Amino acid sequence: MMIPELPDYLTGLGGREYLGLIIALFTLTAGLSRPFSGKITDTVGRVPVMAFGSLVCFVCGFLYPYLLTVWGFLVLRLIHGFSTGTKPTATAAYVADVVPANRRGEAMGTLGLFTAMGMSIGPAIGSWLATGYSMNVMFWTSSAFALLSIGILLRMPETLVNPQPFRFSLLRLKKAEIFDKQALPPFVVLLLQSFSYGAVITLISTLSTSLGIANKGLFFTVYTLASLGVRLVFSRSSDRYGRVPVLLVSSVMLVMSMALLIMAQTPIIFWTAALLYGFSSGMNAPTIQAWTADLADEATRGRAMATMYIALEAGIGLGALGSGWLLNHLLGQAGLSASFGLSSVLALVATGYLGWLWHRDRQPDRRQVRSTDDTALLNGEP
Protein backbone atom coordinates (compact mmCIF):
# COMPACT_ATOMS: atom_id res chain seq x y z
CA MET A 1 0.00 0.00 0.00
CA MET A 2 2.76 2.44 0.90
CA ILE A 3 5.50 1.66 -1.60
CA PRO A 4 4.49 3.83 -4.60
CA GLU A 5 4.10 6.95 -2.44
CA LEU A 6 7.19 6.61 -0.24
CA PRO A 7 9.73 8.07 -2.73
CA ASP A 8 7.76 11.32 -3.04
CA TYR A 9 7.14 11.33 0.72
CA LEU A 10 10.85 11.03 1.51
CA THR A 11 11.65 13.69 -1.11
CA GLY A 12 9.16 15.98 0.62
CA LEU A 13 11.03 15.45 3.88
CA GLY A 14 14.24 16.57 2.13
CA GLY A 15 15.76 13.13 1.57
CA ARG A 16 15.79 12.66 -2.20
CA GLU A 17 19.38 11.42 -2.13
CA TYR A 18 18.30 8.58 0.19
CA LEU A 19 15.60 7.10 -2.07
CA GLY A 20 17.53 3.85 -2.44
CA LEU A 21 17.46 3.40 1.34
CA ILE A 22 13.65 3.17 1.45
CA ILE A 23 13.86 -0.45 0.33
CA ALA A 24 17.50 -1.18 1.22
CA LEU A 25 17.04 -0.55 4.95
CA PHE A 26 13.78 -2.49 4.96
CA THR A 27 15.39 -5.49 3.29
CA LEU A 28 18.51 -5.25 5.48
CA THR A 29 16.64 -6.05 8.69
CA ALA A 30 14.39 -8.48 6.83
CA GLY A 31 17.43 -10.41 5.64
CA LEU A 32 19.23 -10.26 9.00
CA SER A 33 16.16 -11.54 10.83
CA ARG A 34 15.58 -14.49 8.47
CA PRO A 35 17.90 -17.00 10.21
CA PHE A 36 16.28 -16.16 13.55
CA SER A 37 12.75 -16.41 12.18
CA GLY A 38 13.62 -19.72 10.54
CA LYS A 39 14.85 -21.19 13.81
CA ILE A 40 11.94 -19.83 15.85
CA THR A 41 9.49 -21.12 13.23
CA ASP A 42 10.99 -24.63 13.59
CA THR A 43 10.99 -24.55 17.42
CA VAL A 44 8.33 -22.20 18.84
CA GLY A 45 5.83 -22.49 16.00
CA ARG A 46 4.51 -21.00 12.79
CA VAL A 47 1.63 -18.92 14.19
CA PRO A 48 3.61 -16.90 16.79
CA VAL A 49 6.16 -15.86 14.16
CA MET A 50 3.41 -14.83 11.74
CA ALA A 51 1.69 -12.81 14.48
CA PHE A 52 4.93 -11.04 15.37
CA GLY A 53 5.41 -9.95 11.76
CA SER A 54 1.89 -8.51 11.60
CA LEU A 55 2.43 -6.73 14.92
CA VAL A 56 5.50 -4.95 13.54
CA CYS A 57 3.42 -3.77 10.54
CA PHE A 58 0.72 -2.46 12.87
CA VAL A 59 3.13 -0.50 15.06
CA CYS A 60 5.18 0.96 12.20
CA GLY A 61 2.13 1.99 10.19
CA PHE A 62 0.84 3.85 13.22
CA LEU A 63 4.16 5.63 13.88
CA TYR A 64 5.05 6.92 10.38
CA PRO A 65 2.98 10.15 10.73
CA TYR A 66 4.82 11.11 13.92
CA LEU A 67 8.41 10.78 12.64
CA LEU A 68 8.77 13.83 10.41
CA THR A 69 12.54 13.87 9.86
CA VAL A 70 14.52 12.02 7.22
CA TRP A 71 16.46 10.01 9.77
CA GLY A 72 13.37 9.22 11.82
CA PHE A 73 11.68 7.89 8.70
CA LEU A 74 14.72 5.79 7.75
CA VAL A 75 15.01 4.30 11.25
CA LEU A 76 11.36 3.29 11.08
CA ARG A 77 11.93 1.67 7.68
CA LEU A 78 14.76 -0.29 9.30
CA ILE A 79 12.43 -1.53 12.04
CA HIS A 80 9.60 -2.20 9.60
CA GLY A 81 11.81 -4.73 7.82
CA PHE A 82 11.39 -7.19 10.70
CA SER A 83 7.83 -7.77 9.50
CA THR A 84 8.95 -9.17 6.16
CA GLY A 85 11.81 -11.01 7.86
CA THR A 86 9.39 -13.07 9.93
CA LYS A 87 5.88 -13.47 8.57
CA PRO A 88 6.55 -14.89 5.06
CA THR A 89 8.99 -17.46 6.46
CA ALA A 90 6.43 -18.87 8.88
CA THR A 91 3.57 -18.57 6.38
CA ALA A 92 5.38 -20.62 3.72
CA ALA A 93 6.29 -23.28 6.30
CA TYR A 94 2.68 -23.36 7.54
CA VAL A 95 1.33 -23.94 4.03
CA ALA A 96 3.92 -26.65 3.34
CA ASP A 97 2.80 -28.38 6.55
CA VAL A 98 -0.88 -28.61 5.65
CA VAL A 99 -0.74 -29.78 2.01
CA PRO A 100 0.58 -33.01 0.41
CA ALA A 101 3.87 -32.75 -1.46
CA ASN A 102 2.30 -33.52 -4.85
CA ARG A 103 0.07 -30.44 -4.55
CA ARG A 104 2.64 -28.13 -3.01
CA GLY A 105 3.07 -26.02 -6.13
CA GLU A 106 -0.69 -25.51 -6.34
CA ALA A 107 -0.86 -24.59 -2.65
CA MET A 108 1.96 -22.08 -2.93
CA GLY A 109 0.19 -20.69 -5.97
CA THR A 110 -2.98 -20.20 -3.93
CA LEU A 111 -0.98 -18.48 -1.20
CA GLY A 112 0.62 -16.28 -3.82
CA LEU A 113 -2.79 -15.60 -5.35
CA PHE A 114 -4.07 -13.95 -2.20
CA THR A 115 -0.75 -12.20 -1.69
CA ALA A 116 -0.99 -10.84 -5.21
CA MET A 117 -4.55 -9.68 -4.61
CA GLY A 118 -3.34 -7.59 -1.70
CA MET A 119 -0.40 -6.30 -3.72
CA SER A 120 -2.63 -5.31 -6.63
CA ILE A 121 -5.28 -3.56 -4.56
CA GLY A 122 -2.94 -2.08 -1.95
CA PRO A 123 -0.82 0.28 -4.08
CA ALA A 124 -3.84 1.66 -5.93
CA ILE A 125 -5.73 2.24 -2.67
CA GLY A 126 -2.61 3.72 -1.08
CA SER A 127 -2.13 6.23 -3.90
CA TRP A 128 -5.86 7.06 -3.82
CA LEU A 129 -5.79 7.66 -0.05
CA ALA A 130 -2.59 9.73 -0.23
CA THR A 131 -3.91 11.86 -3.10
CA GLY A 132 -7.53 12.20 -1.99
CA TYR A 133 -6.95 12.47 1.75
CA SER A 134 -3.41 12.48 3.14
CA MET A 135 -0.32 10.37 3.65
CA ASN A 136 -1.29 9.96 7.32
CA VAL A 137 -4.62 8.39 6.38
CA MET A 138 -2.74 5.96 4.13
CA PHE A 139 -0.34 5.02 6.95
CA TRP A 140 -3.14 4.47 9.48
CA THR A 141 -5.19 2.41 7.02
CA SER A 142 -2.17 0.16 6.50
CA SER A 143 -1.88 -0.22 10.26
CA ALA A 144 -5.57 -1.16 10.53
CA PHE A 145 -5.17 -3.96 7.98
CA ALA A 146 -2.21 -5.33 9.96
CA LEU A 147 -4.34 -5.36 13.13
CA LEU A 148 -7.02 -7.32 11.29
CA SER A 149 -4.36 -9.83 10.24
CA ILE A 150 -3.35 -10.36 13.87
CA GLY A 151 -6.96 -11.09 14.82
CA ILE A 152 -7.18 -13.79 12.13
CA LEU A 153 -3.85 -15.37 13.07
CA LEU A 154 -4.81 -15.75 16.73
CA ARG A 155 -7.62 -18.11 15.68
CA MET A 156 -5.43 -20.36 13.51
CA PRO A 157 -4.25 -23.78 14.82
CA GLU A 158 -0.53 -24.42 15.18
CA THR A 159 0.92 -27.01 12.77
CA LEU A 160 4.35 -27.54 14.34
CA VAL A 161 4.57 -30.80 16.27
CA ASN A 162 5.70 -30.32 19.89
CA PRO A 163 6.27 -26.53 19.84
CA GLN A 164 8.55 -25.16 22.56
CA PRO A 165 7.99 -22.05 24.69
CA PHE A 166 10.00 -19.06 23.51
CA ARG A 167 13.23 -18.37 25.36
CA PHE A 168 15.97 -15.90 24.50
CA SER A 169 18.57 -18.67 24.23
CA LEU A 170 16.85 -19.66 20.96
CA LEU A 171 18.21 -16.44 19.47
CA ARG A 172 21.76 -17.80 19.73
CA LEU A 173 22.47 -19.23 16.32
CA LYS A 174 24.96 -21.89 15.35
CA LYS A 175 26.68 -21.57 12.00
CA ALA A 176 24.63 -24.41 10.51
CA GLU A 177 21.40 -22.67 11.54
CA ILE A 178 22.08 -19.54 9.50
CA PHE A 179 22.05 -21.05 6.02
CA ASP A 180 20.46 -24.26 4.73
CA LYS A 181 22.75 -25.68 2.04
CA GLN A 182 19.91 -27.74 0.59
CA ALA A 183 18.24 -24.48 -0.46
CA LEU A 184 21.31 -23.24 -2.37
CA PRO A 185 19.87 -23.59 -5.92
CA PRO A 186 16.72 -21.55 -5.12
CA PHE A 187 18.94 -19.08 -3.25
CA VAL A 188 21.13 -18.44 -6.30
CA VAL A 189 18.18 -18.07 -8.68
CA LEU A 190 16.20 -15.74 -6.42
CA LEU A 191 19.22 -13.58 -5.57
CA LEU A 192 19.81 -12.87 -9.25
CA GLN A 193 16.14 -12.38 -10.12
CA SER A 194 15.06 -10.21 -7.19
CA PHE A 195 17.54 -7.43 -8.05
CA SER A 196 14.95 -6.39 -10.64
CA TYR A 197 12.24 -5.94 -8.02
CA GLY A 198 14.47 -3.63 -6.00
CA ALA A 199 14.99 -1.55 -9.13
CA VAL A 200 11.29 -1.55 -10.00
CA ILE A 201 9.99 -0.42 -6.63
CA THR A 202 12.67 2.28 -6.42
CA LEU A 203 12.37 3.67 -9.94
CA ILE A 204 8.91 2.92 -11.28
CA SER A 205 7.37 6.06 -9.76
CA THR A 206 10.03 8.17 -11.50
CA LEU A 207 9.42 6.39 -14.81
CA SER A 208 5.64 6.75 -14.38
CA THR A 209 5.96 10.49 -13.87
CA SER A 210 8.21 10.88 -16.93
CA LEU A 211 5.54 9.15 -19.04
CA GLY A 212 2.74 11.35 -17.68
CA ILE A 213 1.08 8.59 -15.62
CA ALA A 214 -0.36 10.27 -12.52
CA ASN A 215 -1.19 7.22 -10.38
CA LYS A 216 2.20 5.74 -9.56
CA GLY A 217 0.63 2.59 -8.14
CA LEU A 218 -0.93 1.49 -11.44
CA PHE A 219 2.20 -0.37 -12.61
CA PHE A 220 1.96 -2.54 -9.50
CA THR A 221 -1.76 -3.03 -10.07
CA VAL A 222 -1.27 -4.16 -13.69
CA TYR A 223 1.62 -6.51 -12.96
CA THR A 224 -0.14 -8.00 -9.95
CA LEU A 225 -3.38 -8.55 -11.87
CA ALA A 226 -1.31 -10.32 -14.55
CA SER A 227 0.29 -12.36 -11.79
CA LEU A 228 -3.16 -13.24 -10.46
CA GLY A 229 -4.25 -14.47 -13.87
CA VAL A 230 -1.20 -16.71 -14.24
CA ARG A 231 -1.70 -18.20 -10.78
CA LEU A 232 -5.35 -18.96 -11.52
CA VAL A 233 -4.66 -20.66 -14.86
CA PHE A 234 -1.30 -22.33 -14.20
CA SER A 235 -1.54 -23.06 -10.47
CA ARG A 236 -0.51 -26.71 -10.90
CA SER A 237 2.00 -26.28 -13.71
CA SER A 238 5.10 -26.91 -11.59
CA ASP A 239 3.46 -29.98 -10.02
CA ARG A 240 2.94 -31.40 -13.52
CA TYR A 241 6.01 -30.27 -15.45
CA GLY A 242 8.60 -29.76 -12.72
CA ARG A 243 9.92 -26.77 -10.80
CA VAL A 244 12.97 -25.94 -12.93
CA PRO A 245 11.21 -25.86 -16.34
CA VAL A 246 8.54 -23.48 -15.01
CA LEU A 247 11.18 -21.27 -13.39
CA LEU A 248 13.08 -21.21 -16.68
CA VAL A 249 10.05 -19.87 -18.55
CA SER A 250 9.39 -17.25 -15.86
CA SER A 251 13.01 -16.11 -15.95
CA VAL A 252 12.87 -15.56 -19.72
CA MET A 253 9.78 -13.39 -19.22
CA LEU A 254 11.61 -11.39 -16.55
CA VAL A 255 14.48 -10.67 -18.95
CA MET A 256 11.97 -9.49 -21.56
CA SER A 257 10.18 -7.24 -19.06
CA MET A 258 13.37 -5.50 -17.95
CA ALA A 259 14.42 -5.04 -21.58
CA LEU A 260 11.10 -3.34 -22.34
CA LEU A 261 11.49 -0.98 -19.37
CA ILE A 262 14.81 0.14 -20.84
CA MET A 263 12.94 1.13 -24.02
CA ALA A 264 9.78 2.46 -22.32
CA GLN A 265 9.23 5.76 -24.11
CA THR A 266 5.45 5.29 -24.42
CA PRO A 267 2.74 4.01 -22.03
CA ILE A 268 2.09 1.00 -24.32
CA ILE A 269 5.62 -0.35 -23.80
CA PHE A 270 5.37 0.49 -20.09
CA TRP A 271 2.15 -1.50 -19.64
CA THR A 272 3.49 -4.40 -21.73
CA ALA A 273 6.51 -4.56 -19.42
CA ALA A 274 4.16 -4.59 -16.42
CA LEU A 275 2.19 -7.48 -17.91
CA LEU A 276 5.31 -9.54 -18.61
CA TYR A 277 6.64 -8.78 -15.15
CA GLY A 278 3.35 -10.02 -13.70
CA PHE A 279 3.41 -13.20 -15.79
CA SER A 280 6.96 -13.87 -14.60
CA SER A 281 6.13 -13.20 -10.96
CA GLY A 282 2.98 -15.31 -11.07
CA MET A 283 4.92 -18.34 -12.28
CA ASN A 284 8.10 -17.74 -10.29
CA ALA A 285 7.02 -17.03 -6.71
CA PRO A 286 4.94 -20.15 -5.92
CA THR A 287 7.29 -22.41 -7.88
CA ILE A 288 10.45 -21.33 -6.10
CA GLN A 289 8.71 -21.70 -2.73
CA ALA A 290 7.58 -25.22 -3.63
CA TRP A 291 11.07 -26.04 -4.95
CA THR A 292 12.62 -24.94 -1.67
CA ALA A 293 10.15 -27.03 0.32
CA ASP A 294 10.93 -30.04 -1.91
CA LEU A 295 14.65 -29.76 -1.24
CA ALA A 296 14.33 -29.20 2.53
CA ASP A 297 14.17 -31.73 5.34
CA GLU A 298 10.85 -31.60 7.19
CA ALA A 299 12.57 -30.74 10.49
CA THR A 300 14.38 -27.74 8.99
CA ARG A 301 11.71 -26.46 6.60
CA GLY A 302 11.57 -23.08 8.32
CA ARG A 303 15.33 -22.67 7.98
CA ALA A 304 15.19 -23.55 4.29
CA MET A 305 12.42 -21.02 3.69
CA ALA A 306 14.43 -18.43 5.60
CA THR A 307 17.46 -19.13 3.39
CA MET A 308 15.37 -18.59 0.28
CA TYR A 309 13.99 -15.33 1.65
CA ILE A 310 17.49 -14.12 2.56
CA ALA A 311 18.23 -14.23 -1.16
CA LEU A 312 15.02 -12.32 -1.85
CA GLU A 313 15.85 -9.56 0.62
CA ALA A 314 19.50 -9.35 -0.45
CA GLY A 315 18.56 -9.09 -4.11
CA ILE A 316 15.87 -6.48 -3.51
CA GLY A 317 18.15 -4.46 -1.24
CA LEU A 318 21.02 -4.51 -3.71
CA GLY A 319 18.61 -3.63 -6.50
CA ALA A 320 17.23 -0.68 -4.56
CA LEU A 321 20.67 0.60 -3.56
CA GLY A 322 22.17 0.09 -6.99
CA SER A 323 19.30 1.69 -8.87
CA GLY A 324 19.14 4.61 -6.44
CA TRP A 325 22.87 5.20 -6.90
CA LEU A 326 22.62 4.99 -10.69
CA LEU A 327 19.65 7.38 -10.74
CA ASN A 328 21.57 9.95 -8.70
CA HIS A 329 24.79 9.67 -10.72
CA LEU A 330 23.33 9.13 -14.19
CA LEU A 331 20.46 11.58 -14.17
CA GLY A 332 17.30 11.11 -16.17
CA GLN A 333 16.76 8.33 -18.69
CA ALA A 334 20.39 7.19 -18.50
CA GLY A 335 20.02 6.23 -14.84
CA LEU A 336 16.76 4.39 -15.50
CA SER A 337 18.17 2.53 -18.50
CA ALA A 338 21.34 1.51 -16.67
CA SER A 339 19.35 0.16 -13.71
CA PHE A 340 16.90 -1.86 -15.77
CA GLY A 341 19.74 -3.00 -18.05
CA LEU A 342 21.68 -4.39 -15.10
CA SER A 343 18.50 -6.08 -13.86
CA SER A 344 18.05 -7.69 -17.27
CA VAL A 345 21.62 -9.01 -17.32
CA LEU A 346 21.32 -10.57 -13.86
CA ALA A 347 18.00 -12.17 -14.81
CA LEU A 348 19.71 -13.54 -17.91
CA VAL A 349 22.41 -15.13 -15.72
CA ALA A 350 19.65 -16.75 -13.62
CA THR A 351 18.10 -18.03 -16.84
CA GLY A 352 21.40 -19.60 -17.87
CA TYR A 353 21.82 -21.26 -14.47
CA LEU A 354 18.29 -22.69 -14.63
CA GLY A 355 18.96 -23.92 -18.16
CA TRP A 356 22.07 -25.72 -16.91
CA LEU A 357 20.10 -27.31 -14.04
CA TRP A 358 17.37 -28.41 -16.45
CA HIS A 359 19.93 -29.96 -18.82
CA ARG A 360 21.76 -31.67 -15.94
CA ASP A 361 18.56 -33.15 -14.51
CA ARG A 362 17.62 -34.56 -17.92
CA GLN A 363 20.90 -36.50 -18.19
CA PRO A 364 21.13 -40.04 -16.76
CA ASP A 365 23.46 -40.49 -13.81
CA ARG A 366 26.71 -41.69 -15.44
CA ARG A 367 27.79 -43.53 -12.33
CA GLN A 368 24.48 -45.37 -12.20
CA VAL A 369 24.72 -46.30 -15.90
CA ARG A 370 28.29 -47.59 -15.44
CA SER A 371 27.27 -49.58 -12.37
CA THR A 372 24.38 -51.16 -14.31
CA ASP A 373 26.72 -52.10 -17.19
CA ASP A 374 29.27 -53.63 -14.80
CA THR A 375 26.56 -55.70 -13.11
CA ALA A 376 25.36 -56.97 -16.48
CA LEU A 377 28.89 -58.05 -17.45
CA LEU A 378 29.39 -59.88 -14.14
CA ASN A 379 26.14 -61.74 -14.74
CA GLY A 380 27.33 -62.74 -18.21
CA GLU A 381 24.76 -60.59 -19.97
CA PRO A 382 25.73 -59.05 -23.35
Q: Could you tell me what each predicted segment is?
A:
Residues 1-22, 185, 189, 194-207, ...:
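Helix-loop boundary and gating motifs at the non-cytosolic
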Residues 27-35, 119-120, 224-228, 232, ...:
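Residue-level signature of mid-helix packing/kink "hotspots" within the transmembrane helices
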Residues 32-65, 241:
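Conserved MFS/SLC helix-loop-helix module at the cytosolic interface between two early adjacent transmembrane helices
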Residues 49-62, 143, 245-259:
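Structural signature of the two symmetry-related core transmembrane helices
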Residues 78-115:
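Cytoplasmic helix-loop-helix junction between adjacent transmembrane helices
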Residues 131-143, 325-346:
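A membrane-interface helix-boundary motif in multi-pass transporters
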Residues 144-162, 353-358:
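C-terminal membrane-cytosol helix-exit motif in multi-pass small-molecule transporters
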Residues 158-190, 373-380:
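Juxtamembrane intracellular "pre-TM" segments in multi-pass secondary transporters
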